[in-house]
Amino acid sequence: MFVVYAHRGASEYAPENTMSSFQLGVHMGANGIETDVRRTKDGVLVLFHDGDFKRVIGCEGCIADYTYEELMQFHVKNEKTDTKDIIVKFEDFLRYLGFRDLHFAIELKEDLAEETIALLDRYNMKDKAIITSFKFDYIKRVKELRPDWRIGYLVKEVTEEILSDLASIGGEQLCPQAKYVTAENVEAWHGMGYNVRAWGVANFDLMKNAYDCGVDGMTVNFPDQLISYMVKKQ
């Protein structure tokens, strides 16, 4: 099954990593959601991508500077909307969406394997979720804690070293940047037994190419456009 992962929700149209964005992605027909996990000053896991607040909140600071309650004063911005969306607690996300028939890609932005697995276990997410990161040590730690959990390695261009590292921990998903995806590479990666998910799909041409090359899933800010293209190709 091809998985359309709404990247931080339908983040082209709504403030990223907010309930509005996740809901819109599902409404558009995405069968997967991708999101990012960080930890607050008081140890609460929340969904936030950036290492600081400048881009999406518009001020100085970062998640680790504040308790969860203190974070409620901030609103996540998107230039296409004027909604006042708050930063989402990871557990609230799982409570609201975890029971749905969706795939979940949970990216570790910090070394949070143990805490993330504990919450996912609480909501019976093992068969629905894959834990991913650009940091190899983070996904390696997931496998050390729970070898039965699926992990994905987010990379730019795939190298022999990356393939060797992923194989060494029994990883399931290889996540190359879309601009490096070719049909030949996808075929080779499939031959190695990997599920292939493209990320960094910045425009329609990259989206079209990745889909046509045979990837198994894609992380996109505009799930409606990918779904429309898939329908046309059928």
Predicted regions and their residues:
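Phosphate-group recognition and catalysis centered on beta-loop-alpha active-site segments
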Residues: M1-Q234
